[in-house]
């Protein structure tokens, strides 16, 4: 009985980690895009001495 409970909790944790990894894989390109756009915007303001 205890072993089945331990197996169920391990399986639940693996599923949660897999979902978290999928969310990270989906969000990574968007985060990179925002970071690059932020750099471009800061460079534009810096070059035009607006900062």
Curated annotation (Swiss-Prot):
Cited Pfam families: PXT1 (PF15214)
InterPro entries attached to this UniProt entry: PXT1
UniProt keyword Lipid metabolism, yes or no: no
Motif Microbody targeting signal, chain ranges: 48-51
Superkingdom in the source lineage: Eukaryota
One GO CC term, this protein: peroxisome
Keywords: Peroxisome
Location relative to the cell: Peroxisome
A biological-process GO annotation: spermatogenesis
Summary of the tissues where the protein is detected: Testis-specific.
Record-annotated membrane-spanning stretches: none
Official protein name in the record: Peroxisomal testis-specific protein 1
Organism this protein belongs to: Mus musculus
Lineage summary: Eukaryota, Metazoa, Chordata, Craniata, Vertebrata
């Amino acid at each position: 009985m205890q072993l089945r409970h331990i197996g169920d909790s391990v399986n639940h944790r693996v599923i949660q980690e897999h979902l978290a990894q999928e969310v990270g894989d989906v969000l990574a390109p968007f985060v990179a895009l925002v970071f690059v756009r932020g750099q471009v915007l800061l460079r534009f303001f810096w070059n035009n001495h607006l900062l």
